[in-house]
Amino acid sequence: MEKGVYIIGTSTDIGKTFISGLILKKLREEGRNAGYYKAVLSGAIKDKKGLIPLDCEEVMEISGLKESYENMVSYILENPYSPHLASEVEEVSISMEKIKKDYKSVRDKYDFILCEGSGGIVCPISFSEKKLMLEDIIKEFNLPIILVSNSGLGAINHTVLTVSYLRNLGLKVKGIILNKFNKSDIIHRDNKKIIKELTGVNNISTVPKIEDIEKYDLNELNEVLYGI
């Protein structure tokens, strides 16, 4: 298995943070020394102690990982905008060198790194000073991608287009996860079949709407992680 994966979504609010937490939980329960990293996080909540990155909180709560925010995220922004706009409004300069340095620190501490992207693949990280896209970070880290999509109407279009775009960039798609999958829904079942045929991606896992994480069988993720 690779030394890490990059989790991205077909769009924002698709559930990639929740999925990141599930994957990290599985890896850690298997005995892997697995950590989490996100280059830029926007939409943090401000309290008396500063900015609270909710994505990190969610991942730690699900996975059991205990880590400081500064070791998980390079840039924490308050406004719930695309990273390039949030950083511009908050007058924060995004540096690829800092991102590379922080990622190396996480990589030195953990054997496996689960990186989470910001939104979909066409996501500007910085635009006003020097243009930096999410794809640039993924290329720099040289990690395969797990793509998270919804399971309902629109999933075929969004997923196939994203996979095509990723391949045009020369990025490796390790697998696909269809989130909030309902086995009794004919649309969901058909979407999985058509997506597999149109993309040629064989490693597709499904995650249902989960009320109690402890009751979820993490082995359902084996296909996307291990191809079994």
From Swiss-Prot:
One short Pfam name that applies is AAA_26
InterPro entries membership: DTB_synth_BioD, P-loop_NTPase
> A single GO BP annotation from the record?
biotin biosynthetic process
List the pathway annotation.
Cofactor biosynthesis; biotin biosynthesis; biotin from 7,8-diaminononanoate: step 1/2
Record-annotated residues binding Mg(2+)? T17, D55, E116
Entry's EC annotation: 6.3.3.3
Q: Is the keyword Ligase assigned to this protein?
A: yes
Function, in words: Catalyzes a mechanistically unusual reaction, the ATP-dependent insertion of CO2 between the N7 and N8 nitrogen atoms of 7,8-diaminopelargonic acid (DAPA, also called 7,8-diammoniononanoate) to form a ureido ring.
Tell me which HAMAP family the record gives: BioD
- Return the protein name: ATP-dependent dethiobiotin synthetase BioD
